[in-house]
């Protein structure tokens, strides 16, 4: 929970509609979901799996954002207009990532083990995008709205389309 102040600052930097820390803390469901996730994740790491899942489901009911307590999330995640966001159990998210509403970071099978995506630092995932499977998304990647990503994306790339393909790559 030590990154709360950092998360609040990040929202203030990224969202021109955010006026102050109190507004963000009290009225942004993305922050509420992230706070519940941090507690649920701590419980999950201590093998209190049922309590962790119950807390994550309560957060989902309240915020419309589903984050599995087993996911690993770095500092400064900003979930903007988070309704319908799903973050699966083996998902890994780097620092300073932005996720818009309707995004799914999901698995592609029912097998055990790593089955959800890994996102690098400073990734932006547009509204409605689906990033599926045990794939790697590099640092500084932008994923367009409603894109479907099923394979690795290299650092600095931009991906768009229902069968997402790399259209740019920064050098």
Curated annotation (Swiss-Prot):
EC number of the protein: 2.3.1.30
Pathway: Amino-acid biosynthesis; L-cysteine biosynthesis; L-cysteine from L-serine: step 1/2
GO biological process assignments: cysteine biosynthetic process from serine
Locations listed in the record: Cytoplasm
Keyword Cytoplasm appears in the UniProt entry: yes
Keyword Acyltransferase applies: yes
Catalytic reaction annotation: L-serine + acetyl-CoA = O-acetyl-L-serine + CoA
Impact when changing residue 162 to T: In strain: 60190
InterPro entries referenced in this protein's UniProt entry, alphabetically: Hexapep, Hexapep_transf_CS, LbH_SAT, Ser_AcTrfase_N_sf, Ser_O-AcTrfase, Serine_acetyltransferase, Trimer_LpxA-like_sf
Annotated Gene Ontology cellular component terms: cytosol
Keyword field: Acyltransferase, Amino-acid biosynthesis, Cysteine biosynthesis, Cytoplasm, Repeat, Transferase
Principal subcellular localisation of the protein: cytoplasm
GO molecular function, one term: serine O-acetyltransferase activity
Top-level enzyme category: transferase
Record-linked PROSITE patterns: HEXAPEP_TRANSFERASES
Homology family: Belongs to the transferase hexapeptide repeat family.
Protein name, as recorded: Serine acetyltransferase
UniProt organism field: Helicobacter pylori (strain ATCC 700392 / 26695)
Gene: cysE
């Amino acid at each position: 929970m030590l990154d709360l102040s950092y998360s609040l600052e990040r929202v203030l930097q990224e969202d021109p509609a955010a006026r102050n820390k109190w507004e963000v803390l009290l009225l942004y469901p993305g922050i509420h979901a992230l706070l519940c996730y941090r507690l649920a994740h701590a419980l999950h790491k201590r093998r209190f799996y049922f309590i962790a899942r119950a807390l994550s489901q309560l957060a989902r009911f309240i915020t419309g954002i589903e984050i599995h307590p087993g996911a690993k999330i770095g500092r400064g995640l900003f979930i903007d207009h988070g309704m319908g966001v799903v973050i699966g159990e083996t998902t890994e998210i780097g620092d300073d990532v932005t996720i818009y509403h309707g995004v799914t970071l999901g698995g592609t099978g029912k097998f055990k083990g790593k089955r959800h995506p890994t996102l690098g630092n400073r990734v932006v995932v547009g509204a409605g995008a689906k990033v599926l499977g045990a794939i790697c998304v590099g640092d500084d990647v932008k994923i367009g709205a409603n894109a479907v990503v099923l394979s690795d994306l290299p650092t600095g790339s931009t991906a768009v389309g229902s069968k997402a393909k790399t259209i740019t790559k920064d050098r």
